[in-house]
Amino acid sequence: MAVNLRGVTTVLLAGTGSDDDYVYRAFSGPLHDAGAIVVTPEPQPSRLIAGYLAALDDAARSGAPIAVGGVSIGAAVSTAWALRHPSRAVAVLAALPAWTGEPGNAPAALTARHSARQLREEGLAATVAAMQAGSPPWLAAELTRSWLAQWPDLPDAMAEAAAYVAPTVEELATLTVPMGLAAAVDDPVHPADVAVEWAAAARHAALHTVTLDEMGADPSRLGAACVAALLEL
């Protein structure tokens, strides 16, 4: 199922608390190499999911099919959009999917709920300091920048993302377009097992992996893994 992204508008959605700056750096190089037109909407923390869906709808308004994807919650929302609009999507790029179906006690959902509660109870400065103390330096720097920019609506975005119902295994089995997946083998918040489950469920999917150290040294390693998985189909 060959995929050609040349000239295709490709919309990438950021993860919860992350931003369009990071997702652009992660995906733009590999996608430009493939000839794609890269669009990375700025998250709207006061209406995270609705804002993402509106951005996808806007990109598809010209009538030309688009490629969609993102990181974590961005991967889930874009995949759900592709499932609802099979004639408007040509491919999905799903990096670090966090859970399948109901969020339940998935690590990313628990982390987002905890951070939202801490932000509301202790404030931004204390929560950022705690995040920095428990994160690799590269991730702490990324999230410090994006969290500051998304305050004071950040806890609302985190709570909304933590309640989001991702595509189920049964729904993924109905995905008609090819899907390239990327997982970090040592990421405790986005377990690689979730990406493996998505890849097994979808009809036309491939999975490539990276490590957190590789992502920290060069964000484009994540996007490159995702694009390479898609292009091998």
PLM feature segments, named:
Residues 2-47:
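Conserved HGGG/HGGXW glycine-rich cap/lid loop of the alpha/beta-hydrolase fold
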Residues 32, 48-66:
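Conserved acidic catalytic loop of the alpha/beta-hydrolase fold
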Residues 70-78:
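Gly/Ala-rich beta-loop-alpha elbow adjacent to hydrolase catalytic centers
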Residues 96-145:
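Helix-rich cap/lid subdomain of alpha/beta-hydrolase
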Residues 141-170:
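Hydrophobic, aromatic-rich cap/lid helix
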Residues 188-194:
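Conserved alpha/beta-hydrolase "acid-adjacent" motif
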Residues 204-233:
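Catalytic active-site module of serine/aspartate enzymes centered on a nucleophile-bearing elbow/loop
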